[in-house]
Swiss-Prot record:
Organism, scientific name: Yersinia pseudotuberculosis serotype O:1b (strain IP 31758)
InterPro entries: EF-G-like_DII, EFG_III/V, G_TR_CS, P-loop_NTPase, PrfC, RF3_C, RF3_dom_3_sf, RF3_GTP-bd
The gene coding this protein: prfC
Domain tr-type G as annotated: residue spans: 11-280
Keywords: Cytoplasm, GTP-binding, Nucleotide-binding, Protein biosynthesis
UniProt similarity note: Belongs to the TRAFAC class translation factor GTPase superfamily. Classic translation factor GTPase family. PrfC subfamily.
Organism taxonomic ancestry: Bacteria, Pseudomonadati, Pseudomonadota, Gammaproteobacteria, Enterobacterales
Protein name in UniProt: Peptide chain release factor 3
Length: 529
């Protein structure tokens, strides 16, 4: 393959994830995006819990029962001359570190906001993670077919709370029962909405020109007049779209629509393929790797168990950073210094697997893993380096785990260590006793762990509350001071799954006091894998 053909393939790639608060419509928008990418024929509206029509992107058994997307799956589809990789992120009230880490593997994010509710808690947290890498953000204001808040007010809230400038690309005409469509500020066109056509791609009627009398006929004179006045205000008060500001994560283009009604999603996709960056350079511990390099490099950001219920396998998800992957390729796993031949890599359409013949920078591939691959592992064609920026996040919830059958302690430890390597949960072993404490970012992780311990390791475990409210990884450059710190705080120290020392605090107040008392000790909220 010539360098110019390779460059063309890489330039076509767009890799993004969707971030939202639960129930803002993320799963629905995922489906509609796949519909436009012709990856599915009709959208199985997510009735979620217990209906036979399951959304394409929700699949492990527990998800099917509960109608939530626990696992981060990957879907690839063509759109507008590009090849789009969509990484689905767990979006339910209970999510996990997987969600955070997935955001480290994308070049762009789509933020979905329920226009009736505005900025919600989970959206804030996820935006903080995108800030670690200044990821570009597109915004989709959803649920325009319902009664919503004043759009200007919601934009103002996004700017204020998320510290990002908003540039409206489309603007709604009415909402709820009187929702008539959206006007495209860049194209000077109005797209008219028809309700009840959400399952398929609809032929949308377009009215060219803001002052076209056809618009008054289509939406009614009063609404048209009100809309034109509103638009004048919007154009006066909002930011012009600036591509550089978008790429640096300082400005977000905003699109309005209804994912359920399948309206406005294509405008957002057009913006994504036009403005979102092709695969970006990434830092390693020795240098920066650029997507156009010939040699293959990639890193593992997530490990998923039991994608195939018939086989107890685990699949490691790897983001290709540079070069071209080919079937049967020999790659160096840098951490273990071993060369492995990858003959059966996978590509995904959420649960439907197909074997990869080739993959390029920006793509995500799955590697079969029998416990030898860990999160953060770097694969190269021989070069010794490690990609950085794939962190562990300090858990926010903690439980003590206890066995129903004390003779199975060995299986429990093995299971917990493997689950922690996958990033399903974090394990802490206090220095002062024999407890096993598990830490998570979302409550659902505890359920996932106990059901997987039972099905995969034949271990029945129960959780008990424990007096821990937060954890920090600790280190210090002054050996003497660190020894003193360890001696005086032994009751609050624990080793995590990778034997890294951490401070487990009963309260935030305790943590703050300890940090003040030991200014030379570094307390970290994230830790590199």
């Amino acid at each position: 393959m010539s360098p110019s053909e390779y460059a063309l393939e890489v330039a076509k790639r767009r890799t993004f994830a969707i971030i939202s608060h639960p129930d803002a419509g993320k799963t629905t928008i995922t489906e509609k995006v796949l519909l436009f990418g012709h990856a599915i024929q009709t959208a199985g509206t997510v009735k979620g819990r217990g209906s036979s029509h399951h959304a394409k992107s929700d699949w492990m058994e527990m998800e099917k029962q509960r109608g939530i997307s626990i696992t981060t799956s990957v879907m690839q589809f063509p759109y507008g001359g590009c090849l789009v990789n969509l990484l689905d992120t767990p979006g339910h009230e209970d999510f996990s570190e997987d969600t955070y880490r997935t955001l480290t593997a994308v070049d762009c994010c789509l933020m979905v906001i329920d226009a009736a509710k505005g900025v919600e808690d989970r959206t804030r947290k996820l935006m903080e993670v995108t800030r670690l890498r200044d990821t570009p953000i597109l915004t989709f204001m959803n649920k325009l077919d319902r009664e919503i808040r004043d759009p200007m007010e919601v934009l103002d809230e996004v700017e204020r709370e998320l510290n990002i400038a908003c540039s409206p690309i489309t603007w709604p005409i009415g909402c709820g029962k009187s929702f008539k469509g959206v006007y495209h500020l860049h194209k000077d066109e109005t797209y008219l909405y028809q309700s009840g056509k959400g399952h398929t791609i609809q032929e949308v009627r377009i009215v060219k020109g803001l002052n076209n009398p056809d618009l008054d006929v289509a939406v009614g004179e009063d609404l048209a007049k009100q809309f034109r006045q509103e638009l004048e205000l919007v154009q006066g008060a909002s930011h012009e779209f600036d591509h550089e500001a978008f790429l640096s994560g300082d400005l977000t283009p905003v699109f309005f629509g209804t994912a359920l009604g399948n309206f406005g999603v294509d405008h957002m996709l057009d913006g994504l393929v036009e403005w979102a960056p092709a695969p970006m350079p990434r830092k390693t511990d020795t240098r920066v790797v650029v997507a156009s390099e010939e040699k293959f490099t990639g890193f593992v950001f997530k490990i998923q168990a039991n994608m195939d219920p018939k086989h107890r396998d685990r699949v490691a998800f790897m983001r290709v950073v540079s070069g071209r992957f080919e079937k049967g390729m020999k790659l160096r796993q840098v951490r273990t210094k071993k060369d492995v031949v990858i003959s059966d890599a996978l590509t995904f359409m959420a649960g439907d697997r197909s074997h990869v013949e080739e993959a390029y920078a920006g793509d995500i591939i799955g590697l079969h893993n029998h416990g030898t691959i860990q999160i953060g592992d770097t694969f190269t064609q021989g070069e010794d380096m490690k990609f950085t920026g794939i962190p562990n996040f300090a858990p926010e919830l903690f439980r003590r785990i206890r066995l129903r059958d004390p003779l199975k302690q060995k299986q429990l430890l093995k299971g917990l260590v493997q689950l922690s390597e996958e990033g399903a949960v974090q394990v802490f072993r206090p220095l002062s006793n024999n407890d096993l404490i598990v830490g998570a970012v979302g409550v659902l992780q505890f359920e996932v762990v106990s059901s997987r311990l039972k099905s995969e390791y034949n271990v029945e475990a129960v959780y008990e509350s424990v007096n821990v409210s937060t954890a920090r990884w600790v280190e210090c450059n002054d050996v003497k001071k660190f020894e003193e710190f360890k001696r005086k705080n032994e009751l609050n120290l624990a080793l995590d799954g990778g034997d890294n020392l951490s401070y487990i605090a009963p309260t935030m107040v305790n943590l703050n006091i300890t940090q003040e008392r030991y200014p030379d000790v570094i307390f970290r909220k994230t830790r590199e894998h």
